[in-house]
């Protein structure tokens, strides 16, 4: 059964030097698609796409490989999404089943066998979703998807929680931060959370259970940390970079550990305008361990992913793990949704609902 459908697609057009401009750096194009599955592959209908700050880093262009490849010019922008299989030539994925993975943000897509078989280090790039608790599908691009796996694998694989230790989580209301806050409380840590608004502060303290927190727009980061952790920090879960990273180093205990998840404050700045950290000597003086990661790294993925799959859906269904979503409707809202992450317009995980199952 074949046929062809119109297929509105979000396309990468040009590398930006600051915030991407819709119509210049990205565009929507109708790229008609044949509804015939390639050998061993799939045709999918995209349901919900997740959007993440790290996508801005991928807009540097395909010639820059680093930790994940940059986006190809004139190709669909991809990210962690959930889709329905509408045509299949692969016995592992029957028609009507749900899949998640790194998918093109378009109304429809072709998933070749090569992508199904590919892996990013320890993790497959596409896998089947079993929604055993009948949860809203947006969870599978958030708490049960990239954000949740990032939080879980790094928390148990790198933070290695110790009851009673003090952890500072910045960008604590973000899709990753909110999960780390709750895992840290489950494991008996003292949690300091920082956010960019009073509304978000109320959320992380009164709903997620952080012990204390502060709004860095109202109180300098270093001053707040000295007030809330006068004896220093055991762990920092670092999402922001810039002055937050400097403050982390400045307030660490001896042999403290900084887990670097991202540098969201720096992604939209040219290199010459990025924050220059001036206290790097404190790393050796205080014997600080700094560890960057990607959720699929062998050293944290393999030992933790099965516990994540067995535990997190149950905790979400029970309300033990809470999350917030900022949802935009329709693929035409992709630019607005993406920019909202950098302009204060989103809270928690930013998702783009494209169609119903």
Swiss-Prot record:
Induction section of the entry: Expression is positively regulated by the secondary metabolism regulator LAE1.
Pathway in which this enzyme or protein is active: Mycotoxin biosynthesis
Top-level taxon of the source organism: Eukaryota
Function: Dehydrogenase; part of the gene cluster that mediates the biosynthesis of fusaric acid, a mycotoxin with low to moderate toxicity to animals and humans, but with high phytotoxic properties. L-aspartate is suggested as fusaric acid amino acid precursor that is activated and further processed to O-acetyl-L-homoserine by cluster enzymes aspartate kinase FUB3 and homoserine O-acetyltransferase FUB5, as well as enzymes of the primary metabolism.
MF term (GO), any: oxidoreductase activity, acting on the CH-CH group of donors, NAD or NADP as acceptor
Protein name: Dehydrogenase FUB6
UniProt xrefs under Pfam families: ADH_N_2, ADH_zinc_N
Keywords: Oxidoreductase
Top EC class, one word: oxidoreductase
Biotechnology: Fusaric acid is phytotoxic to plants such as cotton and banana. It has been shown to induce programmed cell death in plants. In addition to a mild toxicity to animals, fusaric acid exhibits acanthamoebicidal, antioomycete, and antimycobacterial activities.
SMART domains, per database record: PKS_ER
Family indicated by similarity: Belongs to the zinc-containing alcohol dehydrogenase family. Quinone oxidoreductase subfamily.
Keyword Oxidoreductase in annotation: yes
Record-listed E.C. numbers: 1.-.-.-
